[in-house]
């Protein structure tokens, strides 16, 4: 029983970091357009993702898709781009 309490406390203290696979977005809900995977990989990793790729002819056109992107980085939400 004591072990269960200690493990629970350790998890609460450590916190849980989550990440998501998503299209990285600018503050105006516009995606980053791309032509090369290397551009997206650099952009995504600089923002804390594990990696990134250029998703050609995807949902949002040619846009950067990041893998394991932290929750504090903006992603493309449904709705229009507000340029």
UniProtKB/Swiss-Prot annotation:
PROSITE patterns per UniProt: LCN_CSAB
InterPro entries documented for this protein: LCN-type_CS_alpha_beta_dom, Scorpion_toxin-like, Scorpion_toxin-like_sf, Scorpion_toxinL, Scorpion_toxinL/defensin
Location of this chain's protein in the cell: Secreted
Extent of the signal sequence: 1-18
SMART domains: Knot1 (SM00505)
One GO term of the biological process aspect: defense response
Key words of the record: Disulfide bond, Ion channel impairing toxin, Neurotoxin, Secreted, Signal, Toxin, Voltage-gated sodium channel impairing toxin
UniProt-listed Gene3D superfamilies: Knottin, scorpion toxin-like
Protein name: Toxin AahP985
Organism encoding this protein: Androctonus australis
């Amino acid at each position: 029983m004591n072990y269960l309490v200690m493990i629970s406390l350790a998890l609460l203290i450590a916190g849980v970091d989550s990440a998501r696979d998503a299209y990285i977005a600018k503050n105006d809900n516009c995606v980053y357009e791309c032509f090369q995977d290397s551009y997206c990989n650099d952009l995504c990793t600089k923002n804390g993702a594990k990696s990134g790729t250029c998703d050609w002819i995807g949902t949002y056109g040619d846009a950067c898709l990041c893998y394991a992107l932290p929750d504090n980085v903006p992603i493309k939400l449904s709705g229009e781009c507000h340029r």
